[in-house]
UniProtKB/Swiss-Prot annotation:
Domain of life of the native organism: Bacteria
Recorded coiled-coil stretches: none
Name of the protein in its database record: Serine hydroxymethyltransferase
Protein function: Catalyzes the reversible interconversion of serine and glycine with tetrahydrofolate (THF) serving as the one-carbon carrier. This reaction serves as the major source of one-carbon groups required for the biosynthesis of purines, thymidylate, methionine, and other important biomolecules. Also exhibits THF-independent aldolase activity toward beta-hydroxyamino acids, producing glycine and aldehydes, via a retro-aldol mechanism.
GO biological process: glycine biosynthetic process from serine; tetrahydrofolate interconversion
Entry GO terms, CC: cytosol
Modified residues (N6-(pyridoxal phosphate)lysine): K229
Primary localization class, coarse: cytoplasm
Cofactor(s) demanded: pyridoxal 5'-phosphate
EC number: 2.1.2.1
Principal EC category: transferase
Length: 421
């Protein structure tokens, strides 16, 4: 027999932990650039009976029977994704962004092939060739980065590296780069050396979909993204590609790197894409950028250094060394968390510290924008952060942290989250 008791009764320990996390999310200012608050309808789809169904294969080409209704859901997700991004082909089955990237590599590369990707410490991602990651172990990566004087991608140097190394693929995309990426130029560079162009837009996908950032789709052979972050969907992955690569990509996802798809998550992706196609999503994405620019300006006015000097998207990287040379990002992150401000330590380009200590904090505005924060609130947030950082290591630290926490909870109480247990 199946125990149909509610979670609170069936497993009070798990229920308690979830309740505590809900309270944390409600009372904290969330500035981690990769986090957001999803739609209740997305959560409803994730918790649906579709979690019970195995559906290896693709719509109308399954290895199991009884897939006629999950087929409807996957077709909806595919068609909405294609429409949202103007893509020729979409695969909605990847379980995550890393799984999506794994499939792209597997579709057209062989182990040992050369790939040109962005250095992690300059704003790239683990799956773009970091030696600790599968990508760096399976493929021969050479890397490009940003200029030390201005924090911007040097496209001329990148082109020279591509011409010298002759990679089979060039990967473009970042997890901590705050400026517009010139996908058209990247396409020219890739075509010039006969390489595939693979754009990982996990961080900026929502901005791209809404027209708040140029799209890589016309220029890239493959485009991957997560479906959370700026898209506000479930945690999952998505790959877009040219029709010519569709068969290779689909085979690389299943059976190449995955088995059964998560149909409840695919349903949630369909809901997310449907919401992103509405006019309100464009306004939301534009507000993310407005808030990010306002928050960056508030930090600059307080004497902080921002890598690249500002932002064009949803995030930016504060280099703490200019104002607080002895303060590590690890200490800053931990102390801000005590004041109910959540962010993450991050290496900065040409970092001199260990990544476990780091010199930068990465700040993003998707989550606070979802809650309803606007430009005027960004000065308040910057003031809270500045107060805490200035007090670290002084006799005032505990008092300032407590006062800031009270100020933050007062602010967040004005913007309640739409969730109930």
């Amino acid at each position: 027999m199946l125990n149909a008791s509610p979670l609170q009764t069936l497993d009070p320990q798990v229920f308690s932990a979830i309740s505590e996390e809900l309270a944390r999310q409600q009372s904290h200012i969330e500035l981690i650039a990769s986090e957001n608050f999803t739609y209740p309808a997305v959560m409803e789809a994730q918790g649906s009976v579709l979690t019970n169904k195995y559906a290896e294969g693709y719509p109308a080409k399954r290895w199991y029977g009884g897939c006629e209704f999950v087929d409807k859901v996957e077709v909806l997700a595919i068609e909405r994704a294609k429409k949202l991004f103007g893509a020729e082909h979409a695969n909605v089955q990847p379980h995550s962004g890393a799984q999506a990237n794994t499939a792209v590599y597997a579709a057209v590369l062989q182990p040992g092939d050369k790939v040109l990707g962005m250095n992690l410490s300059h704003g790239g991602h683990l799956t773009h060739g970091n030696p600790a990651n599968f990508s760096g172990k399976l493929y021969q990566f050479c890397q490009y980065g940003v200029r030390e004087d201005n924090g911007l991608i040097d496209y001329d140097e990148l082109a020279a590296t591509a011409d010298r190394e002759k990679p089979k693929m060039i990967t473009v995309g970042a997890s901590a780069y705050s400026r517009i990426i010139d996908f058209a130029r990247m396409g020219e560079i890739a075509r010039g050396v006969g390489a595939y162009l693979f754009a990982d837009i996990a961080h900026i996908a929502g901005l791209v979909a809404a027209g708040a950032h140029p799209s890589p789709v016309p220029h890239a052979d493959f485009v991957s993204t997560t479906t959370h972050k700026t898209l506000r969907g479930p945690r999952g992955g998505l790959v877009l590609c040219k029709a010519a690569h569709a068969k290779a990509l689909d085979s690389a996802v299943f059976p190449g790197t995955q088995g059964g798809p998560l149909m409840h998550i695919i349903a949630a992706k369909a809901v997310c894409f449907g919401e992103c196609l509405k006019p309100e999503f464009k306004a939301y994405s534009e507000q993310i950028v407005k808030n990010s620019k306002a928050l960056a300006a508030a930090f600059l006015s307080r004497g902080y250094k921002i890598v690249s000097g500002g932002t064009d998207n949803h995030l930016f990287l504060v280099d703490l060394r200019t104002k607080y040379p002895e303060l590590t990002a690890k200490k800053a992150q931990e102390t801000l968390d005590l004041a109910n401000i959540t962010c993450n330590k991050n290496t900065v380009p040409f970092e001199t510290r260990s990544p476990f200590q780091a010199s930068g904090i990465r700040l993003g505005t998707p989550a606070v924008t979802t809650r309803g924060f606007r430009e005027a609130h960004m000065a308040d947030i910057a003031d809270c952060i500045d107060s805490v950082l200035a007090a670290i290591g002084t006799e005032r630290e505990a008092v300032v942290v407590a006062a800031t926490k009270k100020r933050v909870t007062t602010l967040t109480s004005r913007f309640p989250l739409p969730y109930q247990l």
